Amino acid sequence: MFISLWEFFYGHFFRFWMKWLLRQMTGKCELQRIFDTYVGAQRTHRIENSLTYSKNKVLQKATHVVQSEVDKYVDDIMKEKNINPEKDASFKICMKMCLLQITGYKQLYLDVESVRKRPYDSDNLQHEELLMKLWNLLMPTKKLNARISKQWAEIGFQGDDPKTDFRGMGILGLINLVYFSENYTSEAHQILSRSNHPKLGYSYAIVGINLTEMAYSLLKSEALKFHLYNLVPGIPTMEHFHQFYCYLVYEFDKFWFEEEPESIMYFNLYREKFHEKIKGLLLDCNVALTLKV
């Protein structure tokens, strides 16, 4: 109750008068003061909040524009705030970068969601070729005897036909598995080997798909904003999402063996523990989680 009242008072009265007072003292609007004071994710995050909670409709809409409209909205913001480009030459550059990051994050989520919603289709030649590519990357010296085969268990699928394991994450789960195996082949082989440990083993592919869900949920909840705002000085892409997934796969394997669970039956418990660890790291405004091998 008290917190709600404070948020109402702050949003409707205190914030307005504080902004007005600071403008009179510094001769600069809130956006300019943010650019003068902060860098990296802190800067973009504060700009995003300032635009979102502004009473000015032009500023509010600026966080929802498409990439092709960014330049126009930067100019509109400068007009609304009476910012002279000759006196503040850096404002336009900084605002454009922030808007590209802010709107780019929203677009990245839509792109990832679109791929996630696409189910694995065994009648789709591209899907089938991608699945075969995964096998060949992980098992280069061993031939797959048949498309429907118990051999799939060797790389961590549950049944004879892997397509059933992609139901939750769609084709996104397979794309991530292939991306890691193709771009970090030696690490993928090492982790696959470790996943066959007699006591601490786990299903490599199933865990990989599970970590796709983790990466997706963190993106959806906006927990990846600090990470991506620090990492990408512009528009984040699917490549950056795949790279974050690779970080999760590599770090989860280390975490699992450090924790030494009694059995795979405790997977959900340790998965959630790892999830909380990652969420904690992502709260740091200076965070940039990259796979270092």
UniProtKB/Swiss-Prot annotation:
InterPro entries: ELMO_dom, ELMO_domain-containing. Alveolar cells (morphologically type II cells) and alveolar macrophages (at protein level). Expressed in brain, colon, heart, kidney, liver, lung, muscle, placenta, small intestine, spleen, stomach and testis. In lung it is expressed in alveolar macrophages and alveolar walls. PROSITE patterns: ELMO. Signal peptide: none annotated. One of its GO terms (molecular function) is GTPase activator activity. Residues 126-282 form the ELMO domain. GO terms for biological process: defense response to virus; regulation of defense response to virus. Keywords: Antiviral defense, GTPase activation. GO terms for cellular component: membrane. Coiled coil: none annotated. Acts as a GTPase-activating protein (GAP) toward guanine nucleotide exchange factors like ARL2, ARL3, ARF1 and ARF6, but not for GTPases outside the Arf family. Regulates IFN-related antiviral responses. This is ELMO domain-containing protein 2. The lineage of its organism: Eukaryota, Metazoa, Chordata, Craniata, Vertebrata.
